[in-house]
Amino acid sequence: MAKIVKVIGREIIDSRGNPTVEAEVHLEGGFVGLAAAPSGASTGSREALELRDGDKSRFLGKGVLKAVAAVNNEIAQAIVGKDATNQAEIDQIMIDLDGTENKSNFGANAILAVSLANAKAAAASKGLPLYAYIAELNGTAGVYSMPLPMMNIINGGEHADNNVDIQEFMIQPVGAKTLREALRIGAEVFHNLAKVLKAKGMSTAVGDEGGFAPNLASNADALACIKEAVEKAGYVLGKDVTLAMDCASSEFYNKENGMYEMKGEGKSFTSQEFTHYLEELCKEYPIVSIEDGQDESDWEGFAYQTKVLGDRVQLVGDDLFVTNTKILKEGIEKGIANSILIKFNQIGSLTETLAAIKMAKDAGYTAVISHRSGETEDATIADLAVGTAAGQIKTGSMSRSDRIAKYNQLIRIEEALERAGTPAAFPGLKAVKGQA
């Protein structure tokens, strides 16, 4: 038994200068797990609650001392003495103790930090790397794959202070044979994009996720700049590198008139018109994945979009599904989208996250493991992507240490598996729904 002997919570700072919760779980034998909760900017309305203090005299109301107190008191008292290797039991104890549907009592930030720290401590007690332990918890011990990165190299929407409506323009280095090669291709395109933007007299300041955040005449302009950068780097768009977008449509959907208002372009679309706008972009550019291409509540619009694009484009539900199995189940039954974005803190525990990934895979949906715009040096999502053989990861651009921490962890894992004589496959484009 890997007995929990101590649980510690503290307030640390994330990549946006806001507080977040970090937890330590200590076991008998001196094993320790350390984990921090991330934080989103464009959030789905049905996400588990991130508990903030609301005390305007500290961190403009964004302190997390209440959540930290929950870790140090109620949660610690409930799980000290328990077996850390019973992850589902530890998570359920915290969920039951919180007693709310959306974890609003302790905060998903408190519960998640402890959940992940517990898994790390348990892995250490078994002498396993975290990805191997996650695979065991997932019922897929020894089954790994290296994820295809979706690299957000132009930031807009809520992630940048510019006039670009679509939140993320991403590249996928599908021509790579290994994760390390994919990162090299991504870095080369990123540096060439900086040159392209500079030559046009545009800003090369970066947004929350490390991508550039220039003012552009249109969303299509972002794709044109990326195309030029890919070619300047010596790669072929559509063969070596494909494109993906996160529209985060809920951020520019007007609930009062049901229109998608792209203020940066001065255009408004009905739900169906917006799907056809995206369809035209897909005809012009090799866009193989679109995330949140409709408002989270516009299920009719999503059903139409799935009918129009779903056979050839990966349609990822983020704000739509919020890593929640109840909502995902309904989406699967109604044929909404064909992929789910996986964010630990949308649901608030490792056990529930693994359940969402399993449900998606069982239904033939893909699962894309994702960071949040507010991150720390915690790289757990890298281990999650490998340990569940998810096939895809979204963790920002080729700048900002909070993003690079995840990529560097993936490099370490890929190398460790190669050295052990059990290299993990890198599926590339085959990992993307509709592209196999």
Swiss-Prot record:
<dbReference type="InterPro" id="IPR036849">
    <property type="entry name" value="Enolase-like_C_sf"/>
</dbReference>
<protein>
    <recommendedName>
        <fullName>Enolase</fullName>
        <ecNumber>4.2.1.11</ecNumber>
    </recommendedName>
</protein>
<dbReference type="GO" id="GO:0000287">
    <property type="term" value="F:magnesium ion binding"/>
</dbReference>
<feature type="binding site">
    <location>
        <position position="291"/>
    </location>
    <ligand>
        <name>Mg(2+)</name>
    </ligand>
</feature>
<dbReference type="GO" id="GO:0004634">
    <property type="term" value="F:phosphopyruvate hydratase activity"/>
</dbReference>
<feature type="active site" description="Proton donor">
    <location>
        <position position="209"/>
    </location>
</feature>
<dbReference type="GO" id="GO:0000015">
    <property type="term" value="C:phosphopyruvate hydratase complex"/>
</dbReference>
<feature type="active site" description="Proton acceptor">
    <location>
        <position position="343"/>
    </location>
</feature>
<dbReference type="GO" id="GO:0006096">
    <property type="term" value="P:glycolytic process"/>
</dbReference>
<feature type="binding site">
    <location>
        <position position="372"/>
    </location>
    <ligand>
        <name>(2R)-2-phosphoglycerate</name>
    </ligand>
</feature>
<dbReference type="GO" id="GO:0009986">
    <property type="term" value="C:cell surface"/>
</dbReference>
<feature type="binding site">
    <location>
        <position position="318"/>
    </location>
    <ligand>
        <name>Mg(2+)</name>
    </ligand>
</feature>
<keyword id="KW-0963">Cytoplasm</keyword>
<comment type="function">
    <text>Catalyzes the reversible conversion of 2-phosphoglycerate (2-PG) into phosphoenolpyruvate (PEP). It is essential for the degradation of carbohydrates via glycolysis.</text>
</comment>
<dbReference type="InterPro" id="IPR000941">
    <property type="entry name" value="Enolase"/>
</dbReference>
<feature type="binding site">
    <location>
        <position position="167"/>
    </location>
    <ligand>
        <name>(2R)-2-phosphoglycerate</name>
    </ligand>
</feature>
<feature type="binding site">
    <location>
        <position position="246"/>
    </location>
    <ligand>
        <name>Mg(2+)</name>
    </ligand>
</feature>
<keyword id="KW-0456">Lyase</keyword>
<dbReference type="InterPro" id="IPR029017">
    <property type="entry name" value="Enolase-like_N"/>
</dbReference>
<keyword id="KW-0460">Magnesium</keyword>
<dbReference type="InterPro" id="IPR020810">
    <property type="entry name" value="Enolase_C"/>
</dbReference>
<keyword id="KW-0324">Glycolysis</keyword>
<dbReference type="InterPro" id="IPR020811">
    <property type="entry name" value="Enolase_N"/>
</dbReference>
<comment type="pathway">
    <text>Carbohydrate degradation; glycolysis; pyruvate from D-glyceraldehyde 3-phosphate: step 4/5.</text>
</comment>
<comment type="similarity">
    <text>Belongs to the enolase family.</text>
</comment>
<keyword id="KW-0479">Metal-binding</keyword>
<keyword id="KW-0964">Secreted</keyword>
<comment type="subunit">
    <text>Component of the RNA degradosome, a multiprotein complex involved in RNA processing and mRNA degradation.</text>
</comment>
<feature type="binding site">
    <location>
        <position position="394"/>
    </location>
    <ligand>
        <name>(2R)-2-phosphoglycerate</name>
    </ligand>
</feature>
<dbReference type="Pfam" id="PF00113">
    <property type="entry name" value="Enolase_C"/>
</dbReference>
<dbReference type="Pfam" id="PF03952">
    <property type="entry name" value="Enolase_N"/>
</dbReference>
<feature type="binding site">
    <location>
        <position position="373"/>
    </location>
    <ligand>
        <name>(2R)-2-phosphoglycerate</name>
    </ligand>
</feature>
<dbReference type="GO" id="GO:0005576">
    <property type="term" value="C:extracellular region"/>
</dbReference>
<dbReference type="InterPro" id="IPR020809">
    <property type="entry name" value="Enolase_CS"/>
</dbReference>
<feature type="binding site">
    <location>
        <position position="343"/>
    </location>
    <ligand>
        <name>(2R)-2-phosphoglycerate</name>
    </ligand>
</feature>
